[in-house]
Amino acid sequence: MASNDLKTWVSDKLMMLLGYSQAAVVNYLIAMAKKTKSPTELVGELVDYGFSSSGDTRSFAEEIFARVPRKTAGVNLYQKHEAEAAMLVRKQKTYALLDADDDEDEVVVEKKSSVSESRKSDKGKKRFRKKSGQSDESDGEVAVREDSRHVRRKVSEEDDGSESEEERVRDQKEREELEQHLKDRDTARTRKLTEQTLSKKEKEEAVRRANALEKDDLYSLRKVSRQEYLKKREQKKLDELRDEIEDEQYLFGGEKLTETELREFRYKKELYDLVKKRTQDEDNVEEYRIPDAYDQEGGVDQEKRFSVAVQRYRDLDSTEKMNPFAEQEAWEDHQIGKATLKFGAKNKQASDDYQFVFEDQINFIKESVMAGENYEDAMDAKQKSQDLAEKTALEELQEVRRSLPIYTYRDQLLKAVEEHQVLVIVGDTGSGKTTQIPQYLHEAGYTKRGKVGCTQPRRVAAMSVAARVAQEMGVKLGHEVGYSIRFEDCTSDKTVLKYMTDGMLLRELLGEPDLASYSVVIVDEAHERTLSTDILFGLVKDIARFRPDLKLLISSATMDAEKFSDYFDTAPIFSFPGRRYPVEINYTSAPEADYMDAAIVTILTIHVREPLGDILVFFTGQEEIETAEEILKHRIRGLGTKIRELIICPIYANLPSELQAKIFEPTPEGARKVVLATNIAETSLTIDGIKYVVDPGFSKMKSYNPRTGMESLLITPISKASATQRAGRAGRTSPGKCYRLYTAFNYNNDLEENTVPEVQRTNLASVVLALKSLGIHDLINFDFMDPPPAEALVKSLELLFALGALNKLGELTKAGRRMAEFPLDPMLSKMIVVSDKYKCSDEIISIAAMLSIGGSIFYRPKDKQVHADNARMNFHTGNVGDHIALLKVYSSWKETNFSTQWCYENYIQVRSMKRARDIRDQLEGLLERVEIDISSNLNELDSVRKSIVAGFFPHTAKLQKNGSYRTVKHPQTVHIHPNSGLSQVLPRWVVYHELVLTSKEYMRQVTELKPEWLIELAPHYYQLKDVEDAASKKMPKGAGKAAM
């Protein structure tokens, strides 16, 4: 009986070939394919039945012939070996095998000599004892049986090598087929987010029609169809009632009607008026509409602006008169407006009378002044700003472009690009390198033969810069100018200037190793030396040698350009001065114990005492920024209207795009803006109006120990180069000040000169997998600018081999090629690939998405910590483990239709959940790309746990007598993180997501496992002695029950 999948496939093919399909025809074709002996014979029979003799019919016959199951005669391997051995013995009576040195496969035989026969017989006599009456045939049978054992042993040894080689070749062939399928899918799916697509109604209709064949959706489709019909029926009946009233008025207008007829007519009319009024009330919804600030000529529509002033004096129209509560609602709005707390709007000059004195204010010492360079005086800058205010928005943008320092060197830059294939460009931050160079290349005609790609180390920078360039060019974002980041592709076929993260360009190299669609590649912010940037250096260097027509520009904001030049074969350096105003550097007189509190106090002191000008503060991450924002709002609220308005604008990677754009909005007159940023604001973003910089002197850096496999995100002191970059932010538009929350002694003696490249301090497993996918196998000799530790590379190769991504020759397997498609850690990718075997891929991608967003899912307000902990533990009911708890969180949120209120009630960060949903949607699309079916097995949680263990089996630990855990491989004492749901249960065996180093070595995201699973899922990694659980050993009190 053919499987359902085969029947569905044949049915689809019949629809394509003939235009119809029936179950009987499908079964008949499958039976016919089973009976035929070759595809050619099947083609002949199909043509006889009416199929066209075309290539489509031939390919259909070949595919169905290959797909249908066939009956094969079972062969007894033992009998086969017995027969082969008997044949060899018979041949050996006349032939003997001689050793041949030239080829293993060639065997030279010749006649046996009498001496060899006599020796053979002698040996036979010694080996076998004849019984009385035993015939020669019995001796022959014994000899055959003995020789057959020898032959089987020899054949099995040869088969082990040949089977492993055949398996390797088969796996390589399957991997090549998978890569070809991926390329075909990419070619077929050319539509992007910004292309001209169907309307919303057409999309909904297309989706509804596509799902119409799904039996599970039939009920919901019927329900939706009935609801839509009721809406149409309501409007239809309303029109019929109106027509009926009009007809009766026309026909019986002058006639005398009875009382019953009059009552019925009045009833119809009242009913129609009520329904009509309700419809008008529903249509009259109060909503905000984005105002059009400028007309087509670029000027302000003054009449529209001043029409608001006379709004209260105009007469009400007919629709407003129908609202009897309009006056009441207006009065309520007025009263609510008076009762609303407002502060900062009066703009009192309180500093003229007195100054605030903060109890915990900090004493700063003016140490030095950073000299300015190529800057304008205050009068010229003020006159230029007045001139810009009189121009239209488009003229203002063009004038700003011409005022950038790089504009003076435009022609020289284009000439240098034309004369040299590789060019190193050096210019200060804010000089216009990122926004202007791609536009200059576009204007010079480089985009006629390919795109101009510009990489950025951060997602926020790629999005904001692309939006700015699109605005300057006067085009819509996503058309001529677009961006591509990890979970968003805002490009189209029209895109010629493409901004992207360096990681996205690495992923593009998987499908296009020679970057054939690009004419120019710009590696921007090269001085940051991120992991992806260092890998790109080696790849684009080889591509530039292979493609002489490709232009390669390396852009940096620091003067350490000689190193880049030497790496790229002594490439020429094009440097130009920026515009930098003098910056006063202030250090604290004594070290600060709490840099968070010191930063808050410094912000308030600047806001109260210093002249107007925006403030930029550097923090290490999102958590610190949100904490500082909360404290600032609380303290400002206490000061009320005594101080000017302070606008707080955070900026970090996970912040939504609309909130990120607020940092670029001009500050209202009389107010001050404070930007709370990560180190993204050092070089990637340029914010106008910044006059004061507060530098705590710390940043978050990844640190990886290849021996223990522990990767931690540590808060570490910045380098002197980063400190200089941060101080330079204050001198962009006017003379400024930088407040460093550390002493001058710390700066001179404790800070490193430059930041350690990320490639030397992070886990390289995903990078090694990406390079292997690109066909780069000699990783030790890969052309790194700063080579990573050899031990880290070896550990990464060992991990990938253990995960099955590499074979014993170091070649990429089909599973490894699938894993490379997922933008995740290799162990997470392996977990997803294995989930296809256990039919739980739907649950696993939800867990992977939740793990990818880190530990920012639950939050604990200081005043409601007990409630938050109880809400979190509700998801751990039954000691299911942290992974299953994350799955419960996402599933529960999905069941509430992604409710924001549900997140508030359960103390879950809705922003993190939305990001997890975006990640999951992308992973779901990648499942189809790598040919993995989406399946669900929520009732069988052991299948989910086995998939987790299959990906994270190197991360296992066993409970010790003292209540701590010991990792099985590379023994190390670790503990379950206090936030884990199993921190009090203490199971005997656990698998963990990652190790983090805080006050102790903690395991995060822990799930219980059965030790026998390790032998089942990773027999190549674990032996029986590794997982033997001595049940007789005494465990600590309160230890968890045995593994499930």
Curated annotation (Swiss-Prot):
Q: Which residues form the signal peptide?
A: none
Name of the molecule in the record: Pre-mRNA-splicing factor ATP-dependent RNA helicase DEAH1
Q: Which Pfam families does its entry note?
A: DEAD, HA2_C, HA2_N, Helicase_C, OB_NTP_bind
Q: Which reaction does this chain catalyze?
A: ATP + H2O = ADP + phosphate + H(+)
Q: Tell me the tissue specificity.
A: Widely expressed.
SUPFAM superfamilies linked: P-loop containing nucleoside triphosphate hydrolases
**What keywords would UniProt list here?**
ATP-binding, Helicase, Hydrolase, mRNA processing, mRNA splicing, Nucleotide-binding, Phosphoprotein, Spliceosome
Q: What are the recorded GO MF terms, alphabetically?
A: ATP binding; ATP hydrolysis activity; nucleic acid binding; RNA helicase activity
The biased composition feature labelled Basic residues covers 122-132
Binding positions (ATP):
427-434
Q: Which residues carry this modification: Phosphoserine?
A: 135, 138
Organism of derivation: Arabidopsis thaliana
Cited function = Involved in pre-mRNA splicing.
The protein's matches in InterPro entries, at most eight in alphabetical order, are given as: DEAD-box_helicase_OB_fold, DEAD/DEAH_box_helicase_dom, DNA/RNA_helicase_DEAH_CS, HA2_WH, Helicase-assoc_dom, Helicase_ATP-bd, Helicase_C-like, P-loop_NTPase
Q: What is its EC number?
A: 3.6.4.13
Domain Helicase ATP-binding: from-to ranges: 414-577
Cite the PROSITE patterns for this sequence: DEAH_ATP_HELICASE, HELICASE_ATP_BIND_1, HELICASE_CTER
Segment Disordered: which positions? 106-206
Q: Which family does it belong to?
A: Belongs to the DEAD box helicase family. DEAH subfamily. PRP2 sub-subfamily.
**This protein's record includes keyword Transmembrane helix:** no
Tell me yes or no: is Repeat among this UniProt entry's keywords. no
